[in-house]
Amino acid sequence: MFVLVFIVFASGLTFGAEKDMVQFQGVLMTVDVKNRSMVVNEKLCVWNHQTLINDATGSPTTFDRLQTKNWVYIEGVYEKPHHRIVAKTIYLLPNRIDEKEKGLYPFIK
């Protein structure tokens, strides 16, 4: 019984180690709405049906507003095996948000 519990627990640790929460802002370099993917700061980001997209005020908006050279803030999970970030929430930003301005955007951590 102990061995079975240990194996299940150990495998849970392994899966958890392959995914990390990430939060960052950056410039959209490419966007492929058909394949639900984009490159932000040279990082591959994908989204799915659960991903939320909001404007800078936190109000919901649509994925067709994603355009190259625009700034975004991404909250997601880095999947090490696939070398990509699965976005949980995407925020459209007016520009790069520096330390002094972060208080204006409560979602930026």
Question: Which residue ranges define each predicted feature?
Answer:
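Short, flexible, surface-exposed loop segments at domain boundaries
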Residues: 1-44, 56-109
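Short, structured beta-strand/loop micro-motifs enriched in basic residues and often containing a Trp
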Residues: 49-57
